Amino acid sequence: MIKKYSFRKIAITTLLLLLSFLLYNYPKEINTNINDMNKKEINVIRDVNGYLSLIKIDYKSDNIDDKISLIIEDMKNNGLLPKDTSINGFALDNGLLKIDFNKDFLNMKDEDKTIEALVYSLTDLKEINKIMIYIDGNRLSELPISKKKLDLYLDRSYGINKIYDIKSINDISMVMLYFYNKDNNLVPISYFYNDNNDKLSIIFKELKSNTFIANDLTSYLNNEVELMNYELYEDRIVLEFSDKLLNMYIDGSLVEEVKYTIGYSICDTFNVNKVEFAINTKKIDELILAN
């Protein structure tokens, strides 16, 4: 009787310890998953080996004011803005951001690169289409050193990491190209050209060219891949490729680098937020960009 009672007591004690262990660890597991699900990222621009590169950083607040402040602080911390730069204030109305800095803003190391990064980063937010820069209440109409005139409104057409492949100052067009640098950061390129071909043809021609590889940039896109057809809708585009794209299709999805270089280039050029990839009219993958 004593022996049975001892075994029962040991069994109950063991069971209670096991339950305590499970209860202690279970909420921790849930919290980890919830944190991963709620993880938010925002795009900022940093100077990496001479190229303004796209970097994703975590953020906590969905408030647009907080996002703007986060972008400016990151530019200060990474040398694209002078350390003593501060925001006097800003106002956002119908997609136009008016942002007022103190005079330390003018002490930029590379003024054109700073403006490129600032315009790109801020207009990457879905709430902002264009910006106006002020210094202590006065609109910045020209760059302080080069005296380059600035448009009244600065938007994506200002360009970033600009490359000019032009033979004439007439009929200039621009597409956005995205490549990876050797640190595996996406690098946006504003490519200006005179070619009469449609923008999609230009994008895929340049993504597959060796020109940018010589500058330590690559799209990972196989030269044999051909764009067969496309359909452009209001907020998405469907791209139909030759079956050579299957060489970059692994474990049920496109190789990430290929998907992102194509997807970002298309979304930024055509102002859509979704790219669908298809072969023989069958959808094989998609990329949705949100900010």
Predicted feature descriptions by range:
Residues M1-N291:
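Bimodal "functional hotspot" detector
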